[in-house]
């Protein structure tokens, strides 16, 4: 059966699968229901499934929620139908899966990476929003699949099922990597440091959506990702009565303000693009209380890891100086990071040559420019550094609102075309 015929046969099931993931979104490191459902499906298809600390270097995880939050998420997942044994094995902040299928003949190791986490977004309740009309709007407070990872999981399982049904046609080894905590670039490093792609010859990542210019397109590569680092900076001062004893205070809010203004003024870098953004600033408890704590949540980006490191260095200097100016102490905690990445240029024309004849996409450009960051870079860099090849592809979709917006939604036809594309790529490199 061709991959097109397979997707047509499984069309309704794949759409229902995506909608199920959409209804039960789980944010970074809390993907217990999603991961348990995926693992159970992969086991039933005959894959060798490793999960949890089998596929994670625990010391490399970043931005973990508290144990109380994780415990509540585990209990919720079980209440919502997750296999309790699998949830227990996933444990505290170990929601990662690698499924492997080895075929009878020797051949290359081909890997696809799929991200699972949702966003910290409250989904729209507007009547015209398709998940509202269809009854699959998020049922979890302050969590929404607003970046298409629900579709990614459905595509990954669609690929898994297609390959399992046709395993006699392939040679080599297929690895399906289901990664937690892509949002905030927190999860990939721990999987890479556990060695999950050290034997991989071809590494593929993929994203759905992007913008209207790429609707119903398939881009074969990316110009490259920006390196990025996510930091939390906390200033500690001393509270005092703002009217009767202001001289006794150490104003943490002023330290934070000084830092914010100067962080945004960091000089750009001559070797390429650089970014600085303070996304959250929290401080103060009352009108007449001098703030003793200020919290900044910020991110840096750079066209290369070198440029990003420059921005980080300047940021750390500014935060330290702002604290000293206002007689405060401070601490900086890294919550996530990913390096820059370049793709294997020779892969894009080859992928274009096998996707274009399918006739299901309006256009199949060699590459696209996203300007963002993605921790799939860890997987790609490791494979390429060890002599393999890798690329990150785009399934363009006519999204209803920008990524990370409460009204975000994809065209499910594009998701189905994505399964066809992934199956075609897998078949090409596993033959």
Where are the regions that the model predicts?
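Histidine/acidic-residue-rich, glycine-tolerant segments that coordinate divalent metal ions
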Residues: 63, 97, 119-121, 127-144, ...
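Short Gly/Pro-enriched turn/cap motifs at secondary-structure boundaries
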Residues: 86-91, 182, 221-225, 367-371
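Short coil-to-beta-strand
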Residues: 109-112, 227-234, 292, 389-395
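Metal-dependent amide/peptide-bond hydrolase catalytic core
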Residues: 44, 253-431
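Divalent metal-coordination and catalytic microenvironments
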Residues: 21, 42, 112, 149, ...
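Acidic/His- and Gly-rich active-site-bordering loop/insert found
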Residues: 2-145, 158, 169-170
